[in-house]
Regions:
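Bacterial N-terminal signal peptides
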Residues: 5-16
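Carbohydrate-active catalytic/glycan-binding domains of CAZyme proteins
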Residues: 19-176
Length: 176
């Protein structure tokens, strides 16, 4: 059975299918994580966008295996061929993100660690990635948030997130 889902990332970002798919098929899918993300990918479905039901009995669809073995901030996007693409925060302090693919949201490709900030030696993290398909350019776009040590010092005084109990201030910027 085929489902037409509007994919919604944990931050509420609409990823890639557009309103026509919702009108035609009337379903929403929400990707989320529990706790610190050790449990993996969770999905919930809704017919109206207001009432949500956890799928798979609330159990994870995919356990994290790469990076720091976390799956935080999962974002799904369905490509034009019907394949689902998943990106996620895979650790608190590494320079990459997780990536996996699925045709049915049950069977997944091997997970990949994508070192998106390896070219920046001072990069402290790669968090909250989002993926979308740009139909006009016929390509996927992935963007995320990273802090690069000692970059943008003029805004550090404004504060920011702290990494755990280290006291290190994260001065995030968006990269793609």
């Amino acid at each position: 059975m085929r489902y037409g889902w509007l994919i919604v990332g944990v931050c509420g970002v609409l990823c890639a299918l557009g309103a026509r798919a919702v009108e035609a098929r009337g379903s929403y899918l929400f990707s989320y994580f529990i706790g610190n993300g050790e449990d993996g990918l969770h999905l919930a479905a809704s017919r109206d966008g207001l009432t949500w039901e956890a799928l798979n009995g609330g159990q994870s669809f995919l356990k994290p295996e790469v990076g720091g073995k976390l799956m935080r901030d999962p974002c799904l996007c369905q490509g034009p061929d019907g394949t689902f693409h998943l990106v996620w925060t895979s650790s608190w302090g590494e320079q990459g993100i997780g990536l996996a693919h699925s045709k049915d949201l049950v069977t997944w490709s091997p997970q990949q660690f994508v070192p998106v900030m390896a070219h920046e030696p001072g990069a402290m993290n790669a968090w909250a990635p989002e993926i979308l398909y740009d139909a006009g350019a016929s390509q996927f776009v992935i963007y995320w948030s990273s802090t690069i040590k000692d970059r943008f010092p003029e805004t550090i005084a404004a504060g920011g997130d702290r990494i755990g109990q280290t006291g290190v201030i994260c001065n995030h910027r968006i990269y793609y």
